[in-house]
Amino acid sequence: MKDKIAIKKLGTIDLGIVESNPIVFHNELYRFEYIRNGKHRYRHNSIDESYFRLIRVADEAVLPAFGHGLHLGNAFVWKDRIIVTAVEDWGKSRFYQLESTNLYDWTKPEVILEHPSWQGYNTSLCRAENDFILTFELGAPAELVKVPFTMFFARSNDLKTWHIIENTSFGRDFYTGGPMLRYFSPWFYFFYLHGSYENGFQEYVARSRDLKEWELSSRNPVLSSDDDDRILAYPFDAAEIQQIRDAVNINNSDLDMCEWQGHLHMTYSWGNQRGTEFLAQATANCC
């Protein structure tokens, strides 16, 4: 087995946030966050619905909320646009897209993919040659999804109209979750969650030239839970610190990353994969 990529964990920055990803927009680092409502409501969510927000990492400034009522979002930057893809709700059949050019004014969410039999969840978007490739996560129907969850793919050449790429998928025979898709010619790299409640959940990576035939990395797993997840990287109060110290930790999930100042800036989640979860940061050298 090859040596592991050296990922340095920087510590926990929030409680109750799972789906998040870093982006660079106009030479500034931001963190996109999905703020939950309902059973696992974010402790600072003062409204009766989910939403998205951006954090300017340099000073932790919170930008205005957007995407109200949508779920499980993911942000992608293309030139002077921030594109966010999301699902109608956990396990619902419609995927949406909205965008902004200034971080404050957002377009009306538009349906980009839907099917009445789908149970939709997470998405991830990347640029590949002259197209854009979107991966979307489904939990049903059974004829498509053998072992929940399974990832499927769509293509667009204009970031408006999306077409499903026939006969492409990942993870029909084993558990996958929390996708991150990247492209470095000629390979697609797919980061995903794999594991179980009995043995723990870890981040894995696979690659493919065509989104059909996949090769698992010899370096898997690439990210696993350990005590460094509990490093305090934010001025939490005493009760929050105690919650971090006492939490069951069987999971490193929802890894995402971007290049920033010569390094990879990463976000990921840790916790029990049942609602007691934490947002953390990490870094690695660009290979």
Question: What label would you give each PLM region?
Answer:
Residues 1-287:
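Carbohydrate-active catalytic/glycan-binding domains of CAZyme proteins
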